[in-house]
């Protein structure tokens, strides 16, 4: 997934534009007679020759920037400008990671007498007309931005000018302070006394100039409010990071733009053209991709590139993870070969020891540590004049692997009393002789490395221009086949010998079928006289004939989304069938769960943390199955492309899905066995609850009823989503054979009704879930986002339920809640959900800020 301004998200890409400058200016080039020449002014300084030469005054602690080759109007060339964080905060909540890079902008310097301005033209609005008056009308219609101002310190006629850029490079270019304020962490201010130019990473090269600064953000006790900085900074009153700023030469001509197609699987780079004919679309969209040109334009297969696409893996990752990152990212060469390129066209190596990962010349795969587990993402700097990717920047969170290891421990309960592993990596479905916990014999590590390879390929795919494809896993395939690395994969688990979960096929290897289709669309170079438009349409048409789906984020992430096959962290052609397959696997793993899930010497209370991913093992498959209810099967249709038109999910499939989903609300599913509860003591000193812990109503002790409520709420949040409820009303009106909202509510109550109450834990769980169902229906009835008919039907069902509740002494509180709503619906406040521990990486999901 891309982060901040830089993330390619699931999802808007910040772009870099370069078009002619804006307003006409009257700016004399002549320097005042009292200005020294650049060579005279910088004679005692340390020089950094390059694109924009730097001069360091060690005595004054100032950094001077030389701006060469101003034109007759006093304007410089255009440059690509970016900023980033070589040293981050380590806080997933703050979202300020090591290696983060902004999206980049086009800027130029403009001299006005003794002053120089750094100007960012407004390049989102353009004119393709050849008439200068038309172009000027567009430029004058929208504002530009002046990012900084400088005083001319020296000038050399016909050579350039010198400015003091110290304050510019010591500013908070990346917006760290703004982020802290936005997240209500307190009033942090940039402290110049505790900030300095970092000369160790300040460099100038022929095509780029790089400057790094040490910046300290300070606050006092009174203004501190949040805890995120406290979690990661040794002194929360002074948080010091590094910010990096880059100026880069724009790429040369020779790159051919390629039109965006919503079926292609690529991200678009967009701008508005105000000169297109009336009736034509003003929005101009091109896919984003790297420059890749054949040595021989007439070559058709195994073609050599003028310059291969080269990526580098951060050496900061330890083995065996480092090699797994390399191997996974290299899978993409398979897709390029399938698109007609020679082996080695896409290359991945370890980063040279003397290379700076912040340097815009390097495509980088970085390994980042955080306080809590969070999203990985693929970012890119893009020039939308052509859609060319200038730099790919992958950020991989190191705690992802540890979470996967925890999932494997929970599924396997793999340790004997001496800490030896009971199952071999190559045959973890059956017992084996005990072995030491080593990388060669750990089935947990084997699964983690499988996932790390896939993750490296996934995030690298974003930096090649590819969006997510959440429909890929619905295509029929074997567990060993990769449909797309651009999916969010759930580990494929089976039950092996003696009822032991088998993880040997958790994640497949190699690039996916869809990935080859997408790379073929984006990177195949056609013969010079070929009809590219027709050839690209054929690539998509051939894929459509196979029935392979491409459905991305906006149709997959929301709980109220409608597509029956586009989901996150799911498997299987039929979501309900896959949920029914997983439920007994979860039950088998829970039956074996106990002390063997943690190593000897570990506090038993830590079993609570290990239990979380196992107890909630089916959460995303249940969500996927729920989306079949009031589901709509559709494609990204273009007129005349022959793809199937939207179709409501068949009634029998909706009812099958409902039956499967309601199993996750049953007491058999939700009630933990006594064998587990008796080995879950309260948490020990130093092992406090975190957001990764189950909620509790019981204080220090583990609360199995709250755990059940939190799991039930995951199902109910999707099932009674207001958009889904509104579609149930609409689709039933269009086809009376499909389930109605009333039917879904009735079936849900039937599943959680306690027909034979008894004094045991299952009864208490069932009562708690029954109460949660009522709360979710009250919330639906009061939700203005639901249609009026959906709210009315829900209200009627609650009224019909009330007599049953009044006849049961244990349900009087629920009846009172219904009365509270009916007496004053406008002022009714729904109860908060019982929040389950996060399943996805912690932090913003792809809400438009990022691509993970």
Q: Can you say where each PLM-predicted feature lies in the sequence?
A:
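Conserved catalytic/binding loops enriched for acidic/polar residues
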Residues: 472-473, 480-852
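Soluble non-cytosolic domains of exported or imported proteins
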Residues: 100, 315, 319-327, 359, ...
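Sec-exported extracytoplasmic/periplasmic mature domains
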Residues: 330-341, 461-462, 466, 491, ...
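Bacterial N-terminal signal peptides that target proteins for export
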Residues: 1-10
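Bacterial N-terminal signal peptides
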Residues: 9-20
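Solvent-exposed, polar/charged alpha-helical surfaces in well-ordered, non-transmembrane soluble domains
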Residues: 323-330, 334, 450, 454, ...
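Auxiliary tRNA-acceptor-end handling modules of aminoacyl-tRNA synthetases
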Residues: 25-317, 335, 342, 350-443, ...
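The catalytic-center signature of Zn2+-dependent metalloproteases
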Residues: 349-371, 450-504
């Amino acid at each position: 997934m891309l982060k901040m301004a830089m993330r390619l998200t699931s999802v808007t890409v910040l772009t870099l534009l370069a078009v002619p400058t804006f307003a006409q200016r009257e700016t004399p080039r002549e320097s005042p007679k009292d200005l020294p020449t650049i060579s005279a002014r910088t004679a005692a300084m340390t020089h950094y020759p390059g694109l924009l030469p730097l001069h360091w005054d060690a005595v004054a602690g100032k950094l001077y920037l030389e701006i060469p080759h101003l034109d007759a109007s006093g304007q410089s060339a255009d440059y690509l400008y970016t900023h980033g964080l070589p040293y981050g905060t380590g806080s997933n909540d703050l979202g300020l990671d090591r290696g983060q890079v902004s999206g980049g902008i086009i800027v130029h310097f403009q001299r006005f007498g003794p002053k120089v301005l750094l100007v960012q033209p407004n390049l989102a609005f353009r004119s393709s007309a050849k008439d200068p008056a038309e172009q000027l009308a567009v430029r004058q219609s929208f504002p530009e931005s002046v990012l900084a101002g400088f005083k001319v310190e020296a000038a050399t006629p016909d050579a350039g000018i010198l400015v003091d850029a110290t304050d510019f490079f010591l500013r908070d270019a990346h917006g760290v302070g703004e982020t802290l304020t936005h997240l209500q962490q307190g009033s942090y201010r940039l402290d110049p006394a505790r900030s300095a130019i970092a000369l160790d990473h300040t460099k100038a090269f022929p095509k780029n100039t790089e400057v790094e600064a040490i910046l300290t953000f300070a606050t006092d006790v009174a203004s501190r409010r949040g805890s995120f900085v406290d979690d990661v900074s040794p002194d929360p009153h002074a948080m010091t990071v590094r910010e990096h700023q880059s100026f880069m030469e724009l790429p040369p001509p020779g790159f051919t733009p390629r039109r965006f197609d919503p079926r292609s699987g690529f991200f678009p780079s967009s701008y508005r053209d105000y000169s297109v004919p009336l009736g034509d679309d003003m929005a101009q969209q091109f896919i984003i991709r790297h420059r890749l040109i054949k040595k021989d334009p007439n070559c058709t297969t195994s073609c050599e590139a003028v310059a291969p696409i080269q990526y580098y893996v951060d050496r900061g990752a330890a083995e065996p993870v480092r090699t797994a990152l390399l191997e996974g990212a290299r899978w993409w060469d398979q897709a390029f070969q399938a698109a007609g390129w020679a082996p080695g066209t896409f290359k991945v190596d370890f980063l040279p020891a003397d290379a700076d990962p912040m340097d815009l010349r390097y495509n980088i795969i970085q390994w980042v540590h955080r306080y809590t587990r969070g999203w990985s993402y693929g970012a890119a700097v893009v020039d939308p004049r052509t859609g060319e990717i200038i730099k790919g920047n992958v950020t991989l969170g190191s705690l992802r692997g540890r979470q996967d290891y925890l999932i494997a421990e929970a599924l396997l309960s793999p340790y004997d009393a001496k800490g030896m592993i009971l199952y071999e990596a190559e045959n973890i479905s059956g017992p084996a002789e005990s072995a030491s916990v080593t990388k060669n014999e750990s089935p947990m590590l084997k699964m983690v490395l499988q996932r790390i390879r896939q993750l490296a390929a996934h995030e690298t795919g974003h930096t090649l221009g590819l969006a997510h494809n959440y429909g890929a896993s619905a295509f029929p395939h074997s567990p060993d086949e990769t449909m797309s690395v651009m999916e969010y994969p759930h580990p494929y688990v089976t039950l092996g010998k003696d009822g032991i979960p088998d993880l040997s096929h958790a994640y497949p290897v190699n690039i996916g079928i869809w990935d080859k289709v997408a790379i073929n669309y984006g990177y195949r170079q056609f013969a010079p006289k070929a009809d590219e438009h027709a050839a690209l349409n054929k690539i998509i048409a051939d894929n459509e004939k196979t029935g392979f789906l491409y459905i991305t984020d906006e149709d997959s992430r929301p709980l109220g989304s409608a597509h029956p096959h586009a989901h996150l962290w799911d498997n299987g052609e039929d979501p309900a069938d896959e949920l029914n397959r997983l439920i007994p696997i979860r039950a088998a793993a829970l039956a074996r769960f106990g002390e063997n899930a943690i190593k000897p010497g570990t506090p038993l209370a830590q079993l609570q943390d290990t239990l979380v991913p196992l107890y909630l093992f089916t959460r995303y498959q249940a969500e996927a199955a729920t989306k079949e209810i009031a589901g709509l099967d559709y494609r990204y249709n273009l007129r005349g492309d022959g793809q199937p038109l939207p179709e409501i999910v068949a009634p029998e499939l909706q009812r099958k899905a409902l039956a499967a989903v309601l199993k996750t609300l049953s007491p058999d599913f939700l009630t933990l066995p006594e064998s587990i509860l008796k080995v879950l003591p309260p948490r020990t000193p130093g092992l406090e609850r975190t957001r990764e812990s189950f909620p509790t109503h019981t204080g220090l002790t583990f609360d199995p009823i709250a755990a059940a409520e939190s799991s039930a709420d995951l199902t109910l949040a999707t099932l009674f989503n207001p958009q889904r409820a509104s579609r149930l009303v609409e689709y039933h009106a269009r086809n009376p054979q499909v389930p109605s909202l009333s039917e879904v509510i009735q079936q849900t109550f039937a599943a959680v009704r306690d027909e034979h109450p008894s004094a045991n834990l299952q009864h208490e769980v069932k009562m708690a879930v029954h109460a949660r169902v009522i709360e979710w229906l009250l919330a639906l009835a009061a939700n203005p986002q639901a249609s009026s008919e959906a709210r009315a039907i829900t209200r009627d069902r609650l009224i019909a339920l009330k007599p049953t509740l009044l006849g049961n002494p244990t349900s009087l509180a629920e009846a009172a809640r219904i009365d509270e709503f009916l007496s004053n619906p406008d002022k009714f406040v729904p109860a908060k959900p019982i929040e389950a521990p996060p399943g996805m990486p912690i932090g913003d999901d792809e809400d438009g800020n990022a691509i993970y």
